[in-house]
Amino acid sequence: MTASRRTLMVMAGGTGGHVFPGLAVAHRMEAAGWRVVWLGNPAGMEATLVPKHGIPMEYVRFGGLRGKGLKTKLTLPFNLLRACWQSLGALRRVRPDVVLGMGGYITFPAGVMTALSGRPLVLHEQNSIAGLANKVLAKFAKRVLVAFPDALPHAEWTGNPIRAELARTEAPKARYASRSGPLHVLVVGGSLGAAALNEVVPRALALLAPGERPRIVHQAGAKHIDALKANYEAAGFAGGDDVRLVPFIDDMASAYAAADLVICRSGAMTVSEIAAVGVAALFVPFPYAVDDHQTTNAAFLADAGAAVLVQQRDLSAQLLADWLRGQSRASLAAMAERSRSLAKPEATDEVARVCAKVAGANLEQLQ
């Protein structure tokens, strides 16, 4: 069987943290001549996003229990059985040579049926603390891959698959050396915004003398941009060249590369992207993340002196202002270089090669 006839099924959904790394691998496999089919939830973001990338989809209806009512919990056995049946149907139609599980609730029933049908399963865990589904499925997978060391026992540390342009960014030493003047700070709230950052950062800047203030690009999410503007105006900033407030950023690679410092949450993909680019970071983990995984994500870099970790409960305008006052471009450049040294820029290729090998393909087809 030639590479062009081989098929990869990617099962992932729910959040961008599962979908985007799955897309990175999918495109890499397509470039090697593979057919790729995506298994996802028709109600998930993947149902809208994945077809835009030209990847056909199979659908399985299955959701989580966290925060759901009694009715959802009582109907779980039926919903799980239905999801298993739908997954089996998709596997029979697609007949994949290998199945790659990238996370999300649908991974559990689809992964179980993959194992029961005798098809090879590869798992990838994006977070530093594995979810329950991957902990169970790891017992049946041919290969288990992790983005952070020790997330699962007997797993291979590959890093998180990221967009190619992030891995191609110029080395931090050269970037930082080419700059002068005020520090450039990127504040990232994500598509959902981060209220704590939106409130504290403007007040922290107001505590700095004009000559101490960095230039700011602050991304807040479309739903939060008006409130963010009000926060900056209340702190005495009317906007201008030194403060840019944006609802979204299309080119994150360039935004990261232009920054001396990123202030942000610590989702798995954010941490992986920051390391890949090599930029200093101050992480404020989302305090309500499942198993507090954002803290351990951030700690991977912070423990190596490659980032700073501040819990939201400890974050204040005074603390942030004092910390910013003590930073120089040289100190941030050193942090950025340590961050880059911990990156896994070949993660996308490595995950693709593992999938090919499990399917019995010649690895030279993925060079």
Curated annotation (Swiss-Prot):
EC number: 2.4.1.227
Annotated metabolic or biological route of this protein: Cell wall biogenesis; peptidoglycan biosynthesis
Signal peptide (residue range): none
Compartments in which it is found: Cell inner membrane
Main location: membrane
Record membrane topology: Peripheral membrane protein
Enzyme class: transferase
Residue intervals passing through the bilayer: none
GO terms, molecular function: UDP-N-acetyl-D-glucosamine:N-acetylmuramoyl-L-alanyl-D-glutamyl-meso-2,6-diaminopimelyl-D-alanyl-D-alanine-diphosphoundecaprenol 4-beta-N-acetylglucosaminlytransferase activity; undecaprenyldiphospho-muramoylpentapeptide beta-N-acetylglucosaminyltransferase activity
Keyword Cell membrane in annotation: yes
UniProt-listed GO biological process terms: carbohydrate metabolic process; cell division; cell wall organization; lipid glycosylation; peptidoglycan biosynthetic process; regulation of cell shape
Stored NCBIfam families: murG
Job description of the protein: Cell wall formation. Catalyzes the transfer of a GlcNAc subunit on undecaprenyl-pyrophosphoryl-MurNAc-pentapeptide (lipid intermediate I) to form undecaprenyl-pyrophosphoryl-MurNAc-(pentapeptide)GlcNAc (lipid intermediate II).
Protein name, UniProt field: UDP-N-acetylglucosamine--N-acetylmuramyl-(pentapeptide) pyrophosphoryl-undecaprenol N-acetylglucosamine transferase
Protein's organism: Burkholderia vietnamiensis (strain G4 / LMG 22486)
The organism's taxonomic lineage, starting at the top: Bacteria, Pseudomonadati, Pseudomonadota, Betaproteobacteria, Burkholderiales
Name of the gene: murG
